[in-house]
Amino acid sequence: SERNAGRKLYAVDNAFISQHENALLTESFGLRLENVVAVELLRRLHSEYEQLYYLRKVQDFEVDFVVVESSHVRELIQVTYDFIDPSTKLYNREINGLLKGSKLTNCNNMTLIMMRGEKRDIEVNGKIIHCVLAADWLLQRKY
């Protein structure tokens, strides 16, 4: 199956990540942000009908979080630390991951959570991706 549960590991406290020898590298900031989002999503998903997965097609794309409710994909969420320069590989990887995930799951509710970047909606191929700052996303009441 392309939809997996339990293969990505997250720490219940981001302080545990600080113990890693490369904790101050930029990639680590992205890992920490993804961990914060994972813990918050697990806190918000309280119903037995709601589940959290990630989606990966090896060597093709990955979606960090797939929110499923009663066997229906409700939202695709991608997390990145920097989302500033549209010409970068990172920018394209994040957008393409959401678009390919949307096509595969038939879900058009896509969110990109970032620490740095511009809060906006991006339209690509007729689909809307909501780009939100992590602080705003963490403070909203959703689910």
Where are these regions (language model features)?
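Active-site ExK catalytic segment of metal-dependent nucleases
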Residues: 68, 73-86
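Short, hydrophobic beta-strand segments that form beta-sheet elements in well-ordered domains
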Residues: 108-115
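Accessory nucleic acid-recognition modules appended to NTPase machines
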Residues: 1-73
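Domain-level recognition of nuclease-like catalytic cores that cleave nucleotide substrates
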Residues: 115-143
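Mg2+/Mn2+-dependent nuclease catalytic core
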Residues: 82-100
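Short active-site-adjacent structural elements
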Residues: 63, 85-88, 119-123
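Arginine/glycine-rich "motif VI" loop of SF2 helicases in the C-terminal RecA-like domain
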Residues: 44-47, 97-107
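Conserved beta-strand segments of alpha/beta enzyme cores
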Residues: 51, 109, 128-130
